[in-house]
Structures are given as C-alpha cells and as structure tokens.
Amino acid sequence: MKKNAPKSFEEALSRLESLTQAMQGEMPLEDALAAYQEGNELVIYCQTKLAQVEQKLQVLDADGLKELNLESDE
C-alpha cells in the first residue's frame, strides 16, 4: 500500500465499502480505475491480515492444533 495505508483491518474494510459504493454510482473512467486499483490493494492487505490472525490462532491452540473454520454452518 502506497499512500494512506490503513491503520487496521477495520479501517481497510470500511474504505473498501466506501469504494464499492462510489463505484456503483457515476464515476469517470480514470477515477474508477484508481478506485479499483486502491480496492485491490486493500483486498490484499485484508487477506494478509486475516492470514496472520489465522496463523496466530493456530499457534494459540497448539495443544490440539485444530483447523480454523471461519465459515458458519447456517
């Protein structure tokens, strides 16, 4: 992330939601491309943070080392 790197996962997610809403409206092509690029960087940031948290959870559960299932059965 180059400029304005998010300080947290929640901040990145909030920015992604804002970009998504903006792109659903009327937006000049150049702005849409910039928003898409920023969104892609934010997705990578969020995926990295989630992978780090998953890894930490596995370490914390070292006694039984169960696989983490983040999907609900609902």
UniProtKB/Swiss-Prot annotation:
Localization of this protein: Cytoplasm
Example of a GO biological process term: DNA catabolic process
GO molecular function per UniProt: exodeoxyribonuclease VII activity
InterPro entries: Exonuc_VII_S, Exonuc_VII_ssu_sf
EC number of this enzyme: 3.1.11.6
Top EC class for this record: hydrolase
UniProt main location, coarse: cytoplasm
Catalytic activity: Exonucleolytic cleavage in either 5'- to 3'- or 3'- to 5'-direction to yield nucleoside 5'-phosphates
Annotated keywords: Cytoplasm, Exonuclease, Hydrolase, Nuclease
Listed Pfam families: Exonuc_VII_S (PF02609)
One GO term describing the cellular component: cytosol
Role summary: Bidirectionally degrades single-stranded DNA into large acid-insoluble oligonucleotides, which are then degraded further into small acid-soluble oligonucleotides.
Family membership noted in the UniProt record: Belongs to the XseB family.
NCBIfam families referenced in this protein's UniProt entry, alphabetically: PRK00977.1-5 (NF002141), xseB (TIGR01280)
Subunit structure: Heterooligomer composed of large and small subunits.
Protein name: Exodeoxyribonuclease 7 small subunit
Organism the protein comes from: Neisseria meningitidis serogroup A / serotype 4A (strain DSM 15465 / Z2491)
